[in-house]
């Protein structure tokens, strides 16, 4: 199958062509973002098998509700807040949750809302636009409940803005000049049945906390609304055994009633051994076949998935760190393809803590930025893995989608980080829930992002 570029602007989806013809121009910045991300979102939705009605719904949602939140265009002198969501500083991400044997793919948007006050003394952490955005969404989406959201916005942040501005950058989070760790993100999941589910993400910032908020302060915040939870206790016990290996970085929560909302507690690590991936997925042996009847096979499948997307040999030792891709060049900066400090540039993980659960669900994120050879290799690896498990219905569409996202004249073999992460969650029925996260600014061999 050809992996050559097929620009979305040369071959747009039918839904995009129709909307582009009839939706009016609004302003320089709004038109910039709509023309920048609209064709890409349209292509991903089309290739994921969404009905034409669902494509229109998701694209009109993008046009009316998301695009106005993205701030000044990247070309504007007013563009001062560089989001870490993308290497070029844009604040929008797409992801593709792979089909299972009985369900089609699902597409998700993630956005970091930005306005003219982002990063100023009025809003040094850029937290206000996201909260306003959530309340606007609550006016059109049924069943949104922001109780958890307001709780975390109050308990995970201090509010002396002048002090926060002094402490936050660049030393505070050790990020390259110009990039800022976001404080809050909003995820929008477009289900194939037409529903839209939202999640809120929080990266805490308290006075004098150092680089990241300690585990105990995360735990204290969660316990205020959910005092007793076995799954959370299991997570704290696991991560406390080796606090140097897992760094708590973020919380996310479903925007729904506290009694049913799940909390996702995110950690990052510098480690990448295959054995470490298995240790994380079993919570150090706390998750067993009692909780996941197909656990042993799922662990084997996870190792095969990691090998497939990174290109390491089938006999690669389980207790050795993954090798850097040949293109990785430390002289280009600590982050190399979307800047991240070394201590959190290995696996990432979230523990999905549901009310009343005994153990959490665990999702592992495999980073492509350091360990994958190029996007063609990642695409070949993940599609081969899916085909070997009988999940080949959307392989052709996935590959076409990737090629269509590329800048004109580019091929998947010459770019990196179009696929930024591949994640894996074990389902109770034995399946692996696998998601690909898509970069809107893949990198060439010059280590510079290319806006698409």
UniProtKB/Swiss-Prot annotation:
Pathway: Mycotoxin biosynthesis. InterPro entries: Aro_prenylTrfase (IPR033964), Aro_prenylTrfase_DMATS (IPR017795), DMATS-type_fun (IPR012148). GO terms for molecular function: prenyltransferase activity. It holds the Pfam family Trp_DMAT. Its EC number is 2.5.1.-. Keywords: Transferase. One of its GO terms (biological process) is alkaloid metabolic process. The keyword Transferase applies. Belongs to the tryptophan dimethylallyltransferase family. PANTHER family: INDOLE PRENYLTRANSFERASE TDIB-RELATED (PTHR40627), PRENYLTRANSFERASE ASQH1-RELATED (PTHR40627:SF4). Prenyltransferase; part of the gene cluster that mediates the biosynthesis of fusaridione A, a bright yellow trans-fused decalin-containing tetramic acid with antimicrobial activity. The PKS module of fsdS catalyzes the formation of the polyketide unit which is then conjugated to L-tyrosine by the condensation domain of the fsdS NRPS module. Activity of the Dieckmann cyclase domain (RED) results in release of the intermediate fusaridione A. The unstable pyrrolidinedione ring of fusaridione A is opened through a reverse-Dieckmann reaction to afford its ring-opened form. This is Prenyltransferase fsdK.
